[in-house]
């Protein structure tokens, strides 16, 4: 969490995720995984001093956070970050995080269901954790990297 002034919110979500996994509560895991992604995005935007609407929907929030550290489609930095293959993987990570939001809307905590939900298994919980991990690690490692694209160009505009 290098460079994040107050990573406490991330640690809270990680602790809740761990407990929900231990308790075999896939709905709670899915909800917490989505919240971890949102929290990571907002913390990075705060660190970069980028304004955002706290009620911003997930897709624009993630895009804004990715753009703030140079992980957007239009980034033309020299080096490997410019490669189509790298950008394709980065886009995939963003899509994975969006899939997590959609899974949470259907099965996770945060929206009261009109009927009993069924079918979720531990494997779905683990999938949600891995989706959140992929996106959050990508964001946090890029944010803390001394050679990350955002350190060499003005991306706040």
Predicted regions located by residue number:
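Short, charged amphipathic alpha-helical segments flanked by flexible coils
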Residues: 49-93
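Residue-level detector of well-ordered alpha-helical segments, enriched
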Residues: 9, 28-32, 40, 57, ...
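Charge-enriched, short contiguous segments at helix-coil
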Residues: 86-150
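Short, charged/polar, low-complexity loop and linker segments
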Residues: 12-19, 79-85, 113
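Short acidic alpha-helical/loop segments enriched in Asp/Glu that coordinate divalent cations
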Residues: 29-32, 43-61, 149-151
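A structural signal for well-ordered alpha-helices, especially hydrophobic packing surfaces
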Residues: 14, 18-21, 40-44, 69, ...
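Long amphipathic alpha-helical segments
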Residues: 5, 50, 77-80, 110, ...
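Charged alpha-helical initiation segments
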Residues: 1-29, 39, 43, 149-157
